[in-house]
Amino acid sequence: MSAVVVADASPLIAFQQIGQLQLLRTMFGELTVPPAVAREILPSVAPAPWIVERRLTQPIAPLVLRANLGAGESEALSLAVEIRAGLLFVDERAARRVAAALGLSVVGTLGVLLAAKRTGHIGEVRPLVDELLRQGFWVAPRLVKQALLAAAEEGPDDSRS
């Protein structure tokens, strides 16, 4: 992928916890993170040359400040705007709403897993979602169901999730 992808901490930590951090390298090539995210992911995510820290050169956008997000989400949103990132990788609902208001393209953890299946990088989404949930990653059951339906790994009446 050639466009710059700015990442928040939560999805990076989630992929590390399920042993799939390298999948992000495969999918994106390089991820850009602001300093607050770099601090949040250590020591959970070991430093990697394809996770590049980039400092903000402008103040955090007022719309972002008003959203009362965490430092990582705030800096990731502002950096994505500042450098005109092609994609923002973030899971938190409030941050995704602000991103939409700012005109940013967004993907979350489940979206990356679906894309990885579509492109043949993983065979199934369900085992990785199950492991995310075992590791304490919270996602609305409705979103899990939607993702598994999109991955053709669950029928509309399957209630395992």
What are the language-model segments listed below?
Residues 2-87, 93-96, 100-105, 127, ...:
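Active-site-proximal, substrate-binding regions of enzyme catalytic domains
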Residues 110-154:
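Hydrophobic alpha-helical interaction segments
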